[in-house]
């Protein structure tokens, strides 16, 4: 076992050494061709993103066609929309508790409310409303830090698919497992991105972890733990004048990411619609959605 481990470490070191050599050669070539500093910096950014987001076998393909067209429009747009809605409610009806909800937001047409489940848009629009400063900042930071590199690699359509799958999974799961609670925040979508990314990291652990860095990974895990802590607080330890908020979206979004998200993010250089894993994940997801719809119509305690 020790010999195998030594061989794996030696192979990893050789790969990293080869990549560094290729970087130096490419930068030298750009200088000779008059490519300029801007082009060299852009290429360096794409190389870093490829190491963090892709296994080694896919990095070359990405770097050959790497560009910022289209730019990461989806993640930036959804983040601006969430921030705009938060500012609107904070100014119109200032929140009395920075980590709970007030009556102004509880009456919002965006929030998921168990009494108004027939308004189907609420199963998606709840992602625009947040339960306080730390809630909006936590979600925005996580989805921008992870979502922008993901969208640079996989483009907006795929990232949007995973994000919205997590949002819908979050509200439907909450309607089943916590049927009498309100739901706000984009955590379902954020955790879907994280679930898909980290499944890809785990499957390609030996290739991606050295490039990504254990320290960065631990920071992200710490952020997740803190976010889950606040979610549990909002659910179980709210003040008397506050309203408990479900945290089921975090878990359901993570599972959506580990299924659909992993399949989407692991098919970087392949046709997604031709991958049987994608259709298996979609079929399982739709089965869960249909069950949730049936539950809400016929079995929910909120009826």
Curated annotation (Swiss-Prot):
Quote the catalytic residue positions.
187 (nucleophile), 250
What domain of life does the native source organism fall in?
Eukaryota
Which Gene Ontology biological process is one annotated for this entry?
Answer: proteolysis
Example of a GO MF term: serine-type endopeptidase activity
Which Enzyme Commission number(s) are listed? 3.4.21.105
- Stretches with biased composition (Basic and acidic residues): 28-39
Q: Coiled-coil segments, which residues?
A: none
Name of the molecule in the record = Rhomboid-related protein 2
Provide the residue span(s) of the region labelled Disordered: 20-39
Report the top EC class in one word.
hydrolase
> What does this gene product do?
Involved in regulated intramembrane proteolysis and the subsequent release of functional polypeptides from their membrane anchors. Known substrate: EFNB3.
Query: InterPro entries from the xrefs?
Result: Peptidase_S54_rhomboid_dom (IPR022764), Peptidase_S54_rhomboid_met (IPR017213), Rhomboid-like_sf (IPR035952), Rhomboid_IM_Serine_Proteases (IPR051739)
